[in-house]
Amino acid sequence: MDTIFAVSSGLLPSGVAVIRVSGPRVVDIVKTLCGCLPKARFMHHGDLIARDGSFLDSALTVFFPRPHSFTGEDCAEFHLHGGKAVVNRFLDELSTFTGCRLAEAGEFSRRAFIEGKIDLVQAEGLADLIEAETESQRRLAVMGANGHLTELYRHWRNKLMTARALIEAELDFSDEADVSNFSSDKVWQNMQELSDSLCEHIAEGERANILRDGIKVVIVGVPNSGKSSIINRLAGRPVAIVTEEEGTTRDALEVRLILGGLPVLVMDTAGFRETESKIEQLGIDIAKQHVLDADLVILVDDMKNPQKISLPNTSAEIWRVGNKLDICEGDKTRWPIQFSALNGLNFDYFLKEIESFCLHRIAEIGNIFPARKRQIQLLKEAVKEIDSSINYTFLDLSLRAEHLRRASDALGRITGDIDVEDLLDIIFSQFCIGK
C-alpha cells in the first residue's frame, strides 16, 4: 500500500501548515528528514533536512505508531511554517520517497474506516463537521462523529439478530416444549416495538433536515409593498432593486442568514398581481411554488395602502406584517409586527421574531437522529422489512425470518458493517484532501 501525504491545515499562506503522512514508509521518512525517530505522540522540535542535505525548515514533528493513530497506520505530522514555498518544497521532498504520493480527497478517513478506526456514520459526521457553518450544524455533525448514532444502530441490529436466533431455534427444535411457539408472542412484540422506535427516529431525522438545509422563509406581497427593501436590510447590502416602478422583481432572490445558530434561507419573490407580462407571470408562479415549500411565509403589507392577496394553500406558518411604519399615520392595530425596512424602525424586533420562530421549530427535535438522507433511506428500508415480517403471518416462519435478515442488513449498511464498497467513493470524495 502507498504512503500518502497532504496538507491538513487549510489554505496557504498561514502561520503554521500541518502536513499529514500515513502508511508503511512513515518511519523511514521521519528518520530520514528528522535524523531520528521521535518519542511516540510527543512534539519533537528540530531541523528537517532533505536527502540531498539541503535545509527544508525548522519544524515540529509528531509520530503516531500504528494502531494508535487516526488511520490505524503509522502516521506522522510535520508542523511547518505556513509559507507556500516552504510547504511546496517539503511536499516535493516527500514525493521523492518510493511509494509515497499525494493523498486523494478523503483518503486518510477512508483508511481509518478500512482499519476499523471509524465507521461510515462517523465518517459522514466528520465530513459534516468540517463543512458546518452554524452551531446547529456543528451539533448535528458531532452526534455522528462521536459514535452515538453508531451505538444506537448496532443496538437495534442486535435486537434483530436476537429475534432471528429465537426464530431459528423454534425452527430447529420445534419438538422441544420450552422452545415451541416462543417466537409467536415475545419476538413479534419486540419487533413491533423496534419498528415503532425506528419510525419515530426517522420522523426526528426528517424534522431535523432544517438543521442541515436551513429554515426557508419566503417574503411575499403585492408590488411596492417593500419586500425588496426587507431583503436588502436582512442582507446588509443591496441585493434587490428598489424603485417605485411595480414588477421590478421577476425572479426569487435568496439571502442566507444565521439566526440563533441556525441556517436561514430568506427569499424575496415577485409581487402578486394580475399581469399580462409573461415574464412577470412566470416570476409570480415561481413565487407561489416557493410558498408551498416554505417553513414560514411573511406577507408584507404597505401600511399606507394594504391590499388583499390570495396565497396558495400551504402547510407553512403565515405572518402578516406591516411595512413603512415611518410614513403610516392611520390605524396600525391590524399588524402584530410592524416596522420600516427603509430606515430600520422596529426592524430588530421583526428579526428577533423570526429567530424565535426558528428556535421553536427545532425545540421538539430529539437529541439523537439520522443526519443524512442515506441513513434515513436505509432506516425506512429496515422498517419496511420488519413490518413485512410482522404482518405476513401467512408466510412460512423461515420467510418471515428472512425479512428480519434484510432489515438487519439495512442497518448494517448504515454503519458500514456489511456490503458498502460501492458507497465508499461517494462518501469519502466529499472530504478535503488532507482529511
Curated annotation (Swiss-Prot):
SUPFAM superfamilies with a match to the protein in the record: P-loop containing nucleoside triphosphate hydrolases (SSF52540), TrmE connector domain (SSF116878)
The record's free-text note on cofactor binding: Binds 1 potassium ion per subunit.
GO BP terms, alphabetized: tRNA methylation; tRNA wobble uridine modification
Highest rank taxon of the organism: Bacteria
Purpose: Exhibits a very high intrinsic GTPase hydrolysis rate. Involved in the addition of a carboxymethylaminomethyl (cmnm) group at the wobble position (U34) of certain tRNAs, forming tRNA-cmnm(5)s(2)U34.
Pfam family, any one: TrmE_N
The protein's name in its UniProt record: tRNA modification GTPase MnmE
Cofactor(s) needed for function: K(+)
Keyword Nucleotide-binding: yes
List of residues binding GTP: 224-229, 243-249, 268-271
EC nos: 3.6.-.-
Domain TrmE-type G: 214-359
Keyword annotations: Cytoplasm, GTP-binding, Hydrolase, Magnesium, Metal-binding, Nucleotide-binding, Potassium, tRNA processing
Cellular component per GO, a single term: cytoplasm
Subcellular location: Cytoplasm
Native species: Bartonella bacilliformis (strain ATCC 35685 / KC583 / Herrer 020/F12,63)
Main subcellular location: cytoplasm
Family listed: Belongs to the TRAFAC class TrmE-Era-EngA-EngB-Septin-like GTPase superfamily. TrmE GTPase family.
Residues at which (6S)-5-formyl-5,6,7,8-tetrahydrofolate binds: R20, E77, K117, K435
